């Protein structure tokens, strides 16, 4: 749409740009604020403060009760979809068998029709030949001229028989072709739906084979089991801290005592479940020997560090998507 269509003078001055936005037709966009963004310490399912927090390998935080109920529901849904898929496969197999049987029966019927027509033609030829032979024997005793006449008659009879056989075969083939054309026309009429009437689809939708594993409900991409969940151990803010008056700031880093928020990149150790801020990287660089947790002294490797997923700070520089879109029908005004 060109830029001039947004002016108030477009479309005979009926609607201005502000009035069009009030209609809420077409694609509407809105900038998300800080209140619309999930906190790092809130559950990815219920969006409340976590109770008995657990985390997946990709850094999505959940309440233990929420994630377990979600995984159980996924297992139930998988069983239902597997039954539906099995029924659909049995239905396809049954339809395929029915088509093969029908084709086999049609081929048998066509073969029987051809055999019957050939038998009828052969019996008529035998009777005609016997009668002609008797007449020829009698006529041979009488006159040689009559023999010539009988031979001519036999030739005419044979020609008539061949014409009758060709006509019978052509008529049967024409009837079969007409029946096939009628069936095709009826099938097309069933498929054609009136565009102004709401009608259901004639064809059943194909059911794909369901997955046999549960996935993480936050993104739905990577598989997740209940045994893969990691218990999270946050460090509570001390009462002497200056930021303890804020109810949202509940947790801090055990190394630097910095209050954790969406602006701080929080990290978790996979073995013990303790949460740290970005100072864990500095602590990792300073230690030349084997890495160990600052709280419980458990050894860990760099691959066992998980970054906790957060919604962002509300600024565009955080890298998160801060624009929401809603698609509706366009208004012709």
From Swiss-Prot:
Residues 120-181 are annotated as: Disordered. It is found in: Cytoplasm; Nucleus. Residues 73-119 form a coiled coil. GO terms for cellular component: cytoplasm; nucleus. InterPro entries: NOSIP (IPR016818), Znf-NOSIP (IPR031790), Znf_RING (IPR001841), Znf_RING/FYVE/PHD (IPR013083). Regulates nitric oxide production. This is Nitric oxide synthase-interacting protein homolog. The gene is nosip.
């Amino acid at each position: 749409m060109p830029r001039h269509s947004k002016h108030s003078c477009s479309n005979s001055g009926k609607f201005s740009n502000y009035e069009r936005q009030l209609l809420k037709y077409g694609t509407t966009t809105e900038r998300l604020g800080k209140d619309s963004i999930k906190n790092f310490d809130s559950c990815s399912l219920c969006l409340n403060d976590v109770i008995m927090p657990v985390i997946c390998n990709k850094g999505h935080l959940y309440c233990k009760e929420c994630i377990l109920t979600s995984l159980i529901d996924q297992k139930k849904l998988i069983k239902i979809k597997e039954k539906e898929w099995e029924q659909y496969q049995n239905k396809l197999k049954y339809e395929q068998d029915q088509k093969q049987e029908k084709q086999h029966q049609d081929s048998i019927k066509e073969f029987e029709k051809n055999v019957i027509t050939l038998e009828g033609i052969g019996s008529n030829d035998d009777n005609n030949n016997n009668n002609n032979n008797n007449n020829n024997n009698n006529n041979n005793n009488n006159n040689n001229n009559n023999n010539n006449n009988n031979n001519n008659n036999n030739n005419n009879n044979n020609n008539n028989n061949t014409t009758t056989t060709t006509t019978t075969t052509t008529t049967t083939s024409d009837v079969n072709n007409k029946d096939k054309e009628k069936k095709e026309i009826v099938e097309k009429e069933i498929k054609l739906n009136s565009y102004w009437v709401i009608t259901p689809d004639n064809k059943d939708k194909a059911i794909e084979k369901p997955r046999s594993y549960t996935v993480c409900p936050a993104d739905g991409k990577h598989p997740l089991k209940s045994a893969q969940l990691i218990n999270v151990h946050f460090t509570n803010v001390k009462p002497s801290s200056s930021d303890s008056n804020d109810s949202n700031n509940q947790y801090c880093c055990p190394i630097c005592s910095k209050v954790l928020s969406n602006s701080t990149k929080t990290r978790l150790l996979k073995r013990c479940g303790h949460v740290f801020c970005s100072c864990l990287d500095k602590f990792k660089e300073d230690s030349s020997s084997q890495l160990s947790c600052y709280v419980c002294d458990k050894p860990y490797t760099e691959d066992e560090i998980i970054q906790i997923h957060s919604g962002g700070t509300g600024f565009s520089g955080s890298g998160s998507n801060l624009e929401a879109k809603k698609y509706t029908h366009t208004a012709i005004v």
